[in-house]
Amino acid sequence: KVKQSSYHLAWLVELFVHSTDINDEVPIHRWKIFVDAHNGDILDKFDQVRTATVSGQVTGSVKDEPYGLAQTRPMPHVKIDVSGVGSTYTDEEGFYSIDIGNQSRNVTVKLEGAYLNTNNANGSDASITRSVDPGTTEDFSFGSLNSTSGERDTYYHANIIHDHAKSIHSGLTGADYVMPARVNIGSEDSYWPCNAYWDYTGINMFSEGGGCAGTDEM
């Protein structure tokens, strides 16, 4: 049976709502409400805000010197990989946002980004993988449980140097590529310890030894 259409004289009311409830996963709403012009009944309503994105910040525990105090700092230009969707990058303050559709996805974050890819020469590379839902905030933090201090320090400071150089002259493009950064290199390398070098492609940083602090933490 075909349902017959009916018409109502109605008011269209638009409401922009910003919730102050810290537990509200979607704090912003933009409602369209159709109100019967004769009796005030609500005929229909819908929220124009769509919760198809996931956003958050990537941070890491970083030092300014080998024996200094570590602080939580934003990780810039980190690549955010989303299964079945693609990738995006954090900004200079470590924030990201990406549309993931209407289903849960696996997100993988490494200390790899637009300008640097850190590789642990004597262990597993820093990596975090987590299932995320649309419309949620997902922060990722690199610390001692998922990375080495050399990976974190090298990634952070190399990116800071890159961005500082670009701020002086935007035409400096020689480092605008994903530079390999080998860290935690040990005695398997004949140049170890107390050393670091550039091999015309990437940087190589050594672990602690021989009375020297790790150059990947300097």
Please place each PLM-identified region on the residue numbering.
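Glycine-centered loop/turn motifs
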Residues: M75-V82, S104, G135-T137
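Surface-exposed loop/turn motifs at beta-strand-loop junctions within extracellular Ig-like
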Residues: V17, L111-Y115
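Short pre-active-site segment immediately N-terminal to the catalytic Zn-binding motif
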Residues: M205-M218
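Structured interaction patches on ligand/partner-binding surfaces of diverse proteins
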Residues: L116-D139
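Glycine-centered loop-to-beta-strand initiation motif
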Residues: G56, G84-L111, N122-A126, F140
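Segments that shape or occlude catalytic/ligand-binding pockets
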Residues: K1-P74, D81-Y89, T173-G202
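Extracytoplasmic/periplasmic, Sec-exported soluble proteins
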Residues: S5, P27, N146-H157, A213-D216
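Zn2+-dependent metallopeptidase catalytic core
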Residues: E93, S97, F142-M179
